[in-house]
Amino acid sequence: MFNEITKSVTWNGKVLELSTGKIARQADGSVTVKMGNSVLLCTAVVANTAKEGIGFFPLTINYREMAYAVGKIPGGFFKREGKASEREVLVSRLIDRPIRPLFHPAFVNETHVTCTVLSYDPETPVDILAIIGASAALALSPAPYLEIVAASKVGLINGEFVLNPTLELLKTSQLDLVVAGTTESVMMVESEAHLLSEAQMLEAVKFGFESFQPVVKIIKELAEEAKRPKLEMQDLYPSVLKNEIEQLFAKEIEQAFAIKSKQERSTSLDLISEKVITHFISNIENKKYNNYQIESALKSVESDILRKEILEKNKRIDGRSTMDIRQIACEVGLLPSAHGSALFTRGETQSLVSSTLGTSLDEQIVDNLEGEYKERFMLNYIFPPYSVNEAMPMKAPSRREVGHGKLAWRAINPILPNKVQFPYSIRVVAETTESNGSSSMATVCGSSLALMQTGIPIKAPVAGIAMGLVKEGKKFAVLSDILGDEDYFGDMDFKVAGTSEGITALQMDIKISGVDFKIMKVALEQARLGRLHILEQMNKVISKPNSELSKNAPSTTTIKIDKDKIRDIIGPGGKIIKEICETSGAKIDISDDGTVSVYAADRDKLKIASDKIKAIAIEPEIGEIFNGTVTKILDSGAFINYLGNKDGFVHISEISEERIDTVSSVIKQGDIVKVKLIGFDNKGKAKLTIKNADKDKSLNNPKPQNSINNAKENSEHVRCDSIKKRAWNEDNNAETAEFITERKYFN
């Protein structure tokens, strides 16, 4: 019944298996990918007719993760998979980027590729398997897919490159890099790095490129054995048409490209396009050339003119040389009510960035195949139509916006303080207010400025730059800080972000084959010089984080308690924690490991809540002195309430240095007295003394008052001080971290 074809290879100690002919046989191309316990179904479907006049290749990639792949039922009311998650969008783009440039330029048939995770194994990189499966499915389809793509993931652990590291290994890796390409060249790179050098990044790309070559081989073998026919393609346009356009309109196009303003240049080129179409209108009526052929030939002429100016004259559209960076302007603090804000402008590209601090309750909950976790750093990239002067409605975030936001997130994330150092959640929103090349890198620069203005203790300022490439034969030019037109007509989009010390993110998309590691090395070094120049301009405005947080930011602290004390803070039915929140106005979040995060609108409310928590959860030590309230008088002594909710007993012999006949002759119910903890009886009850404590000069000696509230305030204040002293004297990382946090941000 099935005519199944299977190819396999042992890859990094695991068997990678590709098979076709059993599942989804009616699809033009269908491949099942297996590695470990991961199983993916990748299909490709090609429309029978071309979509004439569309102006671009209508390729759609959909990556889907099914809940049953890990034995789960989806949450929500409908209990089924809904719209694509952020991860699904990002992996879809990861598949699209190395594949899209490899189709015949005249191919405009609707093409859909779907990659579905049927079974998930956390020990295998399913995003890499999806790229491999999509490439194999297209190789089996009738689409004119000109070269075979494969991919690999690279980590860096203890100075050694690791192929396809597991999720657990990635937690300790200095690098998370995906590289895809053919047998000849790299086509795509996506990475997050922890301040690695250009040489290390280049070696990582080489390592990944060499590692996936056996996979390219088995995809080719699978396609050759399946022997599926391919669509025959004609030239995109007749060469005679291009020659005629070049002869008639080349001078006008050159003059248009000499205009520095994007809007004026675009208007001039649009007018030329109308003239070209009008000139050939008679041929359109005779059906000699169609509109799409004319527009395609015109774009080719424009590309040739732009590229020739760069390669032969070292002259770019706006008059810059290949290494020049556009003029930069930076401003911070322009939004008074925001926690932090910045405006970063580079030429005609501009990003307005704001940063907001929140609590752990504001963290993004992410639920995917790996399980549920929280993300404390969120970065939203917004690209409104007005940024390119287009009259279009605002819509939900596009795939492009999600992808650009994630790239900026990767660039910023490595330089953020950890949660112990800075217990806030952070949201950055970057509005692209103008765009003419590399708005994602403007987002990186603006985000760094806004975070520093907010007072977030980032490790170092970060800047980003987009590089381009023009290559003809062996001659090439690498372009720094590319414009939109240079991106469109060029051969590479190469984005690098990092500090003065190293790279934090690298993204590369190549449109042609033959880009070797020599060119990549030149591009990386040129990007480093450009990045340092941009950082220099940014540092003139703000070079390090503000010492204090914005007055609009919430106050927060973190307290580490014993896990057994969690129930005491919560109380029966949440009574205690609710009372603390209501009386202090603070928010409290308790983790299972005993980490208590407290958030409040101001420092006073924060102190009230945190002191109450410490009073409940932290046990007093023998020898410590507290202010307490007399709650009951007996013949043998008195009960004292201290440290919030704790009670102890003072024997009559411990009340005064002198002999007394009755307790009530010295103290009365409601009095505030100074007590020292001297031990515990056999039932665990605290034994206190007044006579020794009264001589202690380390505390203020308040006059007795009949105020329980004042007694609690004084008691809590004393307790807080003693904790801080102990934090410095004991080898206790949690308490030390807590004290440093309070001292840095709230004292």
Curated annotation (Swiss-Prot):
Residues 623-691 form the S1 motif domain. It is found in: Cytoplasm. Keywords: Cytoplasm, Magnesium, Metal-binding, Nucleotidyltransferase, RNA-binding, Transferase. SMART domains: KH (SM00322), S1 (SM00316). One of its GO terms (molecular function) is polyribonucleotide nucleotidyltransferase activity. Its cofactor is Mg(2+). The keyword Glycoprotein does not apply. The keyword Cytoplasm applies. Involved in mRNA degradation. Catalyzes the phosphorolysis of single-stranded polyribonucleotides processively in the 3'- to 5'-direction. Belongs to the polyribonucleotide nucleotidyltransferase family. This is Polyribonucleotide nucleotidyltransferase. It comes from Rickettsia canadensis (strain McKiel).
